[in-house]
């Protein structure tokens, strides 16, 4: 019996993590309850041009119908999980007083599943959270590089409408720039808004600075200022007073065209210390006047500049808000269309349903969910990757940054990220720093700002019994905050006179009695994937980043295993990912099989009532259906296994069934294997890995992969394509796996080239003879020629057909009669070329599989499973792997599992090393193996060569490490081609495995051969082996018949070059002298 062991139990952190996918579920719930109603309310009244007809939408009474199919059926039928949206509408004829009421269909709204994702066209998709500049006002300073003069600017950013930029120049003028058009004087803008000169000057703290700007444009009336503003902004248009007023109104004062949003209003009020009501979401003259006053004050060193990378100036747009923005776009199009119909149709012929066309809204939502940069194909490699995808935060996408324009400042870690965005987990490539992950305890407040929880502290006393207080980034700036890995005394007070703190974006130390707040957990600053790395504090950040990312790429193996050394977050990660089944009520398991679990739960009380005869009554039945061998988006296998037994009593919240990568409700991504850090005959050079045959024979790293193949039968100009067994020119053996309809039988074993679905396509009839026409007239279409376009198993694929799905009817796109999906399952054992990794960024490729008798073995005769290169540790500085493997070894012999939360140095210096050594010593005492803890070489042991039985020269570090098999499998990458498709233009082989391409001899390869003067080899590679069409055919025939290979001809790409030069009107030709015809010239371009 393996017991779980927490080394620091008495000081263990009560880490109650929030729901890890709550950010998605809460945001979508808010959208349905508030956001959708708000957007509909803006378009709730539409009036026709004559003002006689009025269409009213009763938005609070909107209805969402139950989706037509459940989630499972939507995936099977390749359709969208969505609800129909209906709104009660009234059409009021003001002339006659007639009112028509009707429920109007507004389109289908995709609905989020209980796991926080959407199902679009049968595939799981995630809407990624976007982090953008918050609406508000931002001040910044610019210094002229030549003269060193400082100028200041203020940008007013809105949700919707034109940006306004106020700026000072080196001559002391104040300017305003609206959108991207030319700038105007700040005084003209204020006068055009109706402010008098005296009001302006009285409101400024330093009116003398603004005097210069006033003198430039004085004397001015309000009307003069309006016309001047219009003429300066749009000199090509005639400037009238009405046009000028309308321009100013539409730019800043009309809620339809300009919206600061509640966040923008809140930020402007806070920065400029105004008290304008939150429901006024347009700019006011007071806003602009106060903004200019603040700008002038900066010239006198009064006020503060803004850091745009601070999280108080960036907000998160979650799924609800992103859909809300799309709904607004769709509704504005729908409003225009409805207005047009009202104007064009007779009032008596109109009904609410005939006026409203749902197409604009449906089209916008389809485009957003199907092709937006923020709507992504869900990463379903394992439960962790699924959950991390839902917690991802991206700077990219519409309204955000682009990776080409993003500088280093945006990508960098900022002090305000602490406890909100993980400083470690981010991609490695061009998106580094632009895509992050939410920290474990972070949450998004109603304004969209990220908050982190802290315990209040007073006079060194930390109030851990109270609920933690969530602080926003701007609140935290003004407080002294200590990290969560400080050791407290038994009375709950901070120990030591000084403690590390963060104050005003600076990391320093402070007296412990001055601390305001303390973090609630040591893992508060990092993401869920990073917090699954044990001994994280001993790893370099770059390697921890790789470890976090590679855990998401781990393939679930057939028999997963809990890590001996974990961090305690595995259970929460598995639970919140939604891959395990949890009991909804207390009850007794009445039936368990591989497909379902039936729970008989008591109603109204925790106990099932029993009558006098002993029969149960007053209970309800809960059915839980298990997912069996379903395909994920990444072709891995989704499978659930029951963990309860019939008759067992279950409490609410207990685990009923495990997922593909969970054991006992805990996340299990890999296997514990015996590793040795030593070189072995050069086979582990440069991160290569040497493994034992045991891992292959015992299916230690065997995984199931399910691939999907589909084929469509379409309508063509020559008639419909047919799915049939009657395929021309094929024998019975080739068709052995097909049923009478021409579709493969589930359970059939198929190899590369086998037919999965027989299909014939009508061929264009070239036979225009009278006999052919007569035959067609007699036998109708039957005599028409068809060609074989069957779906075959691609090269390199073999496996068992596990499922066949036929789709017919109205759900298919137009022009398609039938779609068939075939699912082929493969069992993939570990093999040379597969990629493996630990949790510390220690990755490598398998270079050789040795028989277990040849592997190095321990002093008790156990052969090791894996040999890693010791040089992969010192330079990479990921020493956490050494601690993990040694503690894993001790845990294996002691029968214990360990949950070690990262950052344990608060328990004393070298706490990790002390704990690992103590456990090794304990294992040595229990087993009687002195080599488990050798005081001369702690952590190392004498190993013996399996081939000779001789001991190795030096003691070797041996331990049990948790190693993962990654999704980068050699079977998916290896590719070979003898003959295959060519590009039509250049006649060169296509590229890539997907197109069955070949290798290309690029420029650098040509240079290499030129450098060695290999002229004939080069000529052969550039002609016969590449794109000399005539030459390659002749060469093939010569090889088959055993004749000498003829001389090469002209490459096709050279002919393409000549054609391109001819298209530039250059008269260039290439000719060959024919020696057989008296030296006659032959135009090679004509022989194409």
Swiss-Prot record:
GO molecular function, one term: DNA-directed RNA polymerase activity
Presence of the UniProt keyword Transferase in the record: yes
The enzyme's E.C. designation: 2.7.7.6
Keyword Repeat: no
PANTHER family per record: DNA-DIRECTED RNA POLYMERASE I SUBUNIT 2
Matching NCBIfam families: PRK00405.1, rpoB
Name of protein: DNA-directed RNA polymerase subunit beta
Gene name of the record: rpoB
């Amino acid at each position: 019996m393996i017991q779980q062991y927490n080394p620091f139990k008495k000081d263990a952190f009560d880490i109650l993590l929030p729901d890890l996918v709550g950010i998605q579920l809460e945001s979508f719930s808010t959208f349905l309850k508030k956001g959708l109603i708000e957007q509909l309310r803006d378009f709730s009244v539409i009036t026709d041009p004559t003002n006689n007809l009025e269409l009213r939408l009763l938005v609070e009474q909107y209805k969402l119908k139950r989706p037509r199919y459940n989630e499972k059926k939507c995936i099977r039928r390749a359709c969208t999980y969505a609800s129909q949206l209906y709104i009660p509408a009234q059409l009021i004829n003001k002339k006659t007083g007639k009112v028509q009421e009707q429920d109007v269909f507004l389109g289908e709204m995709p609905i989020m599943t209980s796991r926080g994702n959407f199902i679009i066209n049968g595939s799981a998709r995630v809407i990624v959270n976007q982090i953008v500049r918050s609406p508000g006002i931002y001040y910044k300073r610019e210094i002229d590089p030549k003269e060193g003069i400082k100028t200041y600017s203020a940008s007013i950013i809105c949700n919707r409408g034109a940006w306004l930029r106020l700026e000072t120049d080196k001559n002391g003028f104040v300017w305003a720039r609206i959108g991207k058009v030319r700038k105007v004087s700040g005084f003209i803008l204020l006068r055009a808004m109706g402010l008098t000169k005296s009001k302006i000057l009285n409101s400024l703290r330093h009116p003398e600075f603004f005097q210069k700007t006033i003198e430039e444009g004085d004397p001015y009336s309000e009307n003069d200022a309006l016309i001047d503003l219009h003429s300066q902004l749009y000199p090509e248009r005639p400037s009238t007073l009405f046009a000028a007023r309308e321009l100013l109104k539409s730019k800043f004062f009309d809620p339809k065209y300009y919206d600061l949003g509640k966040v923008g209003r809140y930020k402007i009020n806070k920065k400029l210390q105004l008290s304008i009501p939150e429901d006024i979401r347009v700019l006011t003259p007071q806003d602009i006047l106060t903004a200019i006053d603040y700008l002038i004050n900066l010239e006198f060193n009064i006020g503060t500049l803004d850091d745009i990378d601070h999280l108080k100036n960036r907000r998160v747009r979650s799924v609800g808000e992103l859909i809300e923005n799309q709904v607004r776009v769709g509704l504005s199009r729908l409003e225009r269309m409805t207005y047009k119909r009202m104007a064009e149709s007779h009032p008596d012929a109109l009904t609410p349903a005939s006026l409203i066309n749902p197409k604009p809204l449906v089209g916008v939502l389809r485009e957003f969910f199907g092709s937006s940069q923020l709507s992504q194909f869900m990463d379903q490699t394992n439960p962790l990757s699924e959950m991390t995808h839902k917690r991802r935060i991206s700077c990219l996408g519409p309204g955000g940054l682009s990776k080409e324009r993003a500088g280093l400042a945006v990508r960098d870690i900022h002090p305000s990220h602490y406890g909100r965005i993980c400083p470690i987990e981010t991609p490695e490539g061009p998106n580094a720093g632009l895509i992050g992950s939410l920290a474990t305890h972070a949450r998004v407040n109603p304004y969209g700002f990220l908050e982190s929880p802290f315990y209040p502290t007073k006079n060194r006393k930390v109030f851990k019994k109270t609920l933690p207080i969530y602080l926003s980034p701007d609140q935290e700036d003004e407080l002294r905050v200590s990290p969560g890995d400080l050791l407290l005394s038994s009375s709950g007070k901070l120990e030591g006179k000084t403690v590390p703190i963060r104050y005003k974006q600076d990391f320093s130390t402070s007296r412990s009695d001055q601390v305001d707040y303390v973090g609630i957990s040591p893992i508060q600053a990092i993401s869920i994937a990073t917090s699954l790395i044990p001994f994280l504090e001993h790893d370099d950040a770059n390697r921890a980043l790789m470890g976090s990312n590679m855990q998401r790429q781990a393939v679930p193996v057939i028999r997963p295993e809990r890590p001996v050394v974990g961090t305690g977050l595995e259970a929460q990660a598995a639970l919140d990912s939604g891959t395990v089944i949890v009991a909804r009520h207390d009850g007794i398991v009445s039936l368990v099989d591989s497909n379902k679990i039936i729970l008989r739960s008591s109603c109204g009380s925790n106990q099932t009532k029993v009558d006098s005869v002993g029969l149960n009554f007053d209970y309800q039945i809960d059915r839980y259906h298990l997912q069996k061998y379903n395909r994920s988006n990444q072709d891995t296998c989704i499978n659930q296994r029951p963990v309860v037994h019939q008759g067992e009593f279950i409490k609410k919240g207990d685990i009923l069934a495990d997922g593909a990568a969970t054991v006992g409700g805990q996340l299990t991504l890999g296997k514990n294997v015996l590793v040795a850090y030593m070189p072995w005959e050069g086979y582990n050079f440069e991160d290569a890995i040497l493994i034992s045959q045991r891992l292959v024979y015992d299916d230690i790293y065997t995984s199931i992969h399910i691939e999907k193949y589909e084929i469509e039968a379409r309508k063509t100009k020559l008639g419909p394509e047919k799915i049939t067994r009657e395929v021309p020119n094929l024998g019975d053996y080739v068709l052995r796996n097909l049923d009478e309809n021409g579709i493969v039988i589930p359970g059939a074993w198929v190899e590369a080239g086998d037919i999965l679905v027989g299909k014939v396509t009508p061929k264009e009839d070239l036979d225009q003879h009278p006999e052919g026409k007569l035959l067609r007239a007699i036998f109708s279409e039957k005599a028409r020629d068809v060609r074989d376009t069957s779906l075959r198993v691609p090269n390199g694929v073999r496996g068992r057909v596990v499922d066949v799905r036929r789709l017919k009817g109205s759900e298919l796109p137009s022009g398609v009669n039938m779609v068939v999906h075939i699912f082929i399952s493969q069992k993939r054992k570990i093999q040379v070329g597969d990629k493996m990794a630990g949790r510390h960024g220690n990755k490598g490729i398998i270079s050789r599989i040795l028989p277990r008798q040849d592997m190095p073995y321990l002093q008790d005769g156990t052969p090791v499973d894996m040999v890693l290169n010791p040089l992969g540790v010192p330079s990479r500085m990921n020493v956490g792997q050494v601690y993990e493997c040694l503690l894993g070894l001790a845990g294996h012999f002691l029968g214990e599992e360990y949950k070690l939360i990262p950052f344990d140095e608060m328990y004393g210096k070298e706490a990790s090393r002390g704990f690992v050594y103590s456990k090794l010593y304990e294992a040595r005492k229990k087993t009687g193996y002195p080599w488990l803890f050798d005081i001369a070489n702690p952590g190392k042991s004498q190993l013996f060569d399996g081939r000779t039985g001789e001991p190795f020269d030096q003691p070797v570090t041996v331990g049990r490490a948790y190693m993962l098999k990654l999704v980068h499998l050699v079977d998916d990458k290896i590719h070979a081609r003898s003959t295959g498709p060519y590009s039509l233009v250049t006649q060169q082989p296509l590229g890539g495995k997907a197109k069955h391409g070949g290798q290309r001899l690029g420029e650098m390869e040509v240079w290499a051969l030129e450098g060695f003067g290999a002229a004939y080899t080069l000529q052969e590679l550039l002609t016969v082996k590449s794109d000399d069409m005539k030459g390659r055919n002749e060469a093939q025939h010569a090889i088959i018949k055993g004749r000498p290979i003829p001389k090469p001809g002209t490459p096709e790409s050279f002919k393409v070059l000549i054609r391109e030069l001819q298209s530039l009107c250059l008269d260039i030709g290439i000719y060959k002298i024919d020696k057989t015809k008296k030296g006659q010239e032959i135009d090679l371009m004509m022989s194409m």
